[in-house]
Amino acid sequence: MRKHTDKPQLASKLVLRRVAIDTYRENVAYLHRDCAVYRAEGFQALSKVEVRANGRHILATLNVVDDPNIVACNELGLSEDAFAQMAVIDGQPASVSQAEPPQSIGALRRKLAGERLGREDFLGIVRDIAELHYSKIELSAFVVATNRDELDREEVYFLTEAMVASGRTLNWHEPLVVDKHCIGGIPGNRSSMLVVPIVAAHGLLCPKTSSRAITSPAGTADTMEVLAKVELPVDQLADIVRTHRGCLAWGGAAHLSPADDVLISVERPLAIDSPGQMVASILSKKIAAGSTHLVLDIPIGPSAKVRSMPEAQRLRRLFEYVAGRMHLSLDVVVTDGRQPIGNGIGPVLEARDVMRVLENDPRAPNDLRQKSLRLAGRLIEFDPDVRGGDGFAIARDILDSGRALAKMNAIIAAQGAKPFDHNHPQLGALTFDICASESGVVTGIDNLQVARIARLAGAPKVIGAGIDLFHKLGEAVTSGEVLYRVHAGFQSDLDFARQACAKSTGYTLGRAEDVPHVFTEF
């Protein structure tokens, strides 16, 4: 069988054309239906092809077009990602040929049949995924197979190990490198932007790399980008971390566990987040980033990812097993996931909340402050010079004294500060209010629905869009009182958000005794 690195046996010459289509982490090639090469090679739509140009080669999924304005008969089109990988210019000579299936396709088929896979199987699959040898169809098959027949804990370990091996691993040359991560699903919840400066001010090394939002109204990187640059070269990032003991940056530039980013591109549209994939995704990123100690936040709530304590404990045990095998010290904390954390949902609104907490502003959301202090305290207790149970008080002193604010300002300046005034944030100018339909107590806030409304309003693409919450669980409201305000930058976004609110505001009103009980470990 010919390998992907071998020279094609039959190559057909064309000229390259950049096709301005974002195919989201999938290499796509385009041929005109009347192209002589298309007919001679026996290509079909969705065929796997190998493209060579400029001394480089990629595998791509073939799309067939009928419009010569997109691709002419003598041209080979490449999607944005594919074109960038080839590092070429329009008009460059190129060859295209039938590609052999990825070498790991046999292991994928065995997983689809329900078989248990070993270490070498996962290494092969993840290598092919990271090198973009899998089409979206093959990626979806892998994600569905590992979700339908849940991976056993040994398979999760093998998958995590393979994902770490698929990219680079950072080494900070220190015995204690800490990080904090939440499994997600809770709007707001920008605790990382408070934990990092608190922990760094204590002296612990905390290189925080985060993702952008995919289906949520904002990720940590989106919110931090309101305050500073987050897309930084790895060398610059390392200098910032060594100087300031921490950073808050986008992790995409670091090439850490690249297979995870590819898998996410199909997991999110399918709404699949199986325990095994979740554990492998989170732990591979942290280990690749050089972390030695991790605090993991698992929120529980009626509309959170985890909805019961038994489910949380099962997930905890899986995380602990894999972390132990990977020599990562792990502290799992179960937290309140019944509602959003903080008052703002959307990049600017969340940045406002963070800066208010750092500045000890009386308007700061107390739930965000308290959660961040407790998580920071758990990280500080990794310090061998700190007695167990003292972390919270140390974190609180760092925040109250202004040391956390000073550290955050130093990190912002080092990454490249952007103008931001949390007293007068630039919010979307178009607004509407959602008011209580009756008097009562807020007994439920649907995390999924309020996140959906904020996203329809334009977040995170429109950084000033989102939702400003005025009331939280357990608070009494009167009929007509504003529950939250929706901000948008464009009328169409405002209309979409209004339509979603008409179906469900995400709020439930009732009696005080109807507020759901919370199980936490704080």
UniProtKB/Swiss-Prot annotation:
The keyword Transferase applies. GO terms for cellular component: cytosol. One of its GO terms (molecular function) is thymidine phosphorylase activity. It catalyses: thymidine + phosphate = 2-deoxy-alpha-D-ribose 1-phosphate + thymine. GO terms for biological process: pyrimidine nucleobase metabolic process; pyrimidine nucleoside metabolic process. It holds the Pfam family PYNP_C. Its EC number is 2.4.2.4. It is an enzyme of class 2 (transferase). Keywords: Glycosyltransferase, Transferase. PROSITE patterns: THYMID_PHOSPHORYLASE. PANTHER family: THYMIDINE PHOSPHORYLASE. NCBIfam families: ARCH_P_rylase, PRK04350.1. Belongs to the thymidine/pyrimidine-nucleoside phosphorylase family. Type 2 subfamily. This is Putative thymidine phosphorylase. It comes from Albidiferax ferrireducens (strain ATCC BAA-621 / DSM 15236 / T118).
